[in-house]
A protein has these predicted regions:
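A structured beta-alpha segment of the ubiquitous adenosine-cofactor-binding alpha/beta core
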Residues: 88-145
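Glycine-rich adenosine-cofactor-binding loop
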Residues: 30-47
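Glycine-rich phosphate-binding loop and adjoining beta1-alpha1-beta2 segment
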Residues: 60-105
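Conserved small/polar residues in nucleotide/adenosyl-binding loops
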Residues: 1, 5-14, 217-222
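A short, basic/flexible loop-to-alpha-helix module at the beginning of a structural domain
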Residues: 12-31, 123-124
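Rossmann-fold dehydrogenase core element
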Residues: 175-191, 211-214
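Conserved anion/nucleotide-ligand pocket segment
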Residues: 196-199, 203-219, 223
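Rossmann-fold NAD(P)-binding glycine/threonine-rich loop
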Residues: 141-184
Length: 227
């Protein structure tokens, strides 16, 4: 067994040897990111950016846009970030800066901006430039609604964390990500079901072929489902 493990480790090291010890930045300049919404999806994206992508040298989460709430709103959002029933505790530190309305997470200051509509915010005032805005509210899903984000100064592209409607592209990375062009300013990330099954179906189809099939999935009841 030990020989097998050693052999597997050597094989893996040989495959990834070009990446081992390579600390060359992926991007010449960190990519500014803005979250529109801070529900569970927004908080999980925040975790991915701040826990797994370093100290902002690749993706730099600059701001979160939410609706105005109670005076202790920022403290409530900090507590929600600290704990998740599935993913556990946040890996790092979270500090509330009331004066600047900022959450400092793992040393990264993230500004919380209060607004009700996408085109109300001038992001350039917050030193945000050519940002990718990730809309995780699901309120706007078509080109007309999501284009409102592009009217705000400081935003260059929009990603929706849900299926888009109309002519907008829905992208599942590893399946059709090569369909993205430089002209695309708005993209959708498709549905959770699509992301779960399509990569598997693609692999099976390419290797063996698929004549027909039936998909059955179990899901909690969403708000928009009439029972």
């Amino acid at each position: 067994i030990s020989r097998g493990l050693v052999g597997s480790e050597m094989c893996i090291r040989d495959r990834v040897k070009k990446g081992i010890g390579n600390h060359t930045p992926v991007l010449k300049k960190p990519q500014d990111v803005v979250l529109f919404g801070f529900g569970r999806i927004g908080r999980l994206i925040t975790r991915l950016i701040l826990e797994d992508t370093g100290a902002g040298e690749t993706f730099s989460l600059k701001a979160v846009v939410v609706r105005q709430s109670k005076a202790e709103d920022l403290f409530k959002r900090a507590e929600l970030m600290r704990r998740d029933s599935v993913h556990g505790s946040f890996k790092g530190t979270i500090r509330v800066d009331e004066e600047s309305n900022t959450l400092v997470m793992n040393g990264n200051p993230v500004k919380f901006i209060y607004a009700n509509n996408p085109d109300e915010v001038d992001y350039s005032k917050h030193n945000i430039d050519k940002a990718i805005l990730i809309d995780n509210t699901g309120v706007y899903r078509d080109k007309k609604g999501l284009s409102k984000h592009l009217k705000s100064k400081g935003v260059s592209k929009v990603l929706l964390t849900a299926p888009t409607k109309g002519e907008l592209k829905n992208i599942v990375y590893g399946v059709n990500h090569k369909d993205i062009s430089d002209k695309d300013k708005i993209l959708g990330a498709a549905s959770c079901t699509t992301n779960a099954i399509v990569p598997l179906l693609k692999a099976i189809s390419e290797e063996y072929g698929i004549d027909n099939g039936c998909l059955l999935y179990t899901s909690p009841s969403p708000r928009d489902l009439d029972l």
